Amino acid sequence: EISCSLVGSEMCIRDRSLGILTEAQAFELKKIGVTRYHSNIETAPSHFPDICSTHTYEDKMFTIRNAQKAGLRVCSGGIFGLNETAKQRVEMAFELKRLGIDSVPLNLLTPIPGTPFADNKTLTPLEILRAYAVFRFILPKALIRTAGGREVNLRDLQALALNGGLNGIMIGGYLTTGGRSTDADKQMIKDLGRKVTVPVL
């Protein structure tokens, strides 16, 4: 059984459900009507071995290439705050550009007690906004959205993300943390003079 959801006009499969994707699996998904596959690269290739021990960066590339071979559009981004350097954030952006990714969720680590990254130093709101702006310069045509952790890390500067390079926002709850109310986010978007559109990935 495949867990999937309809988002806008696209059926989306998330990699937390399917993990590493073979070429045959990718073509099966395409055959049943899936149009987009989600698989974050998480961080820069040079930093990946420092944050993940269950699979390799090449496993990520294997999955993304197979999805693309089958004609699936790939949604891929990562997390800021994994003790990466500013240079590695730029490296990550160029890697997404190289892969031809047009849908980029950018999460912000929320350190949680008892986890391996509990003691990580969080980025300041201005560091995050600078990183967002850099991603926009490197990926000028991509849908780049702020996602998990924005409430905790950006705090009162959340709205500036949408005026500083990003053109999307993920609302509601996330994988491990809750978000703020949908009504509050809609009001923020309205206050910026923007409109809420059909959700896309």
Specify the residue positions occupied by each region the protein language model found.
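Alpha-helix N-cap and loop-to-helix initiation/capping positions
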Residues: 52-59, 84-91, 119-127
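Oxyanion-binding "anion nests"
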Residues: 75-81, 89-110
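Acidic (Asp/Glu)-rich catalytic clusters
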Residues: 30-33, 65, 69, 97-98
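Single conserved hydrophobic/aromatic residue that forms the stacking wall/gate
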Residues: 1-13
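Auxiliary Fe-S-binding modules of radical SAM enzymes
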Residues: 10, 97-201
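Catalytic cores of alpha/beta
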Residues: 22-29, 83-95, 152-163
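Conserved radical SAM core fold
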Residues: 21-26, 35-57, 73-75, 79-83, ...
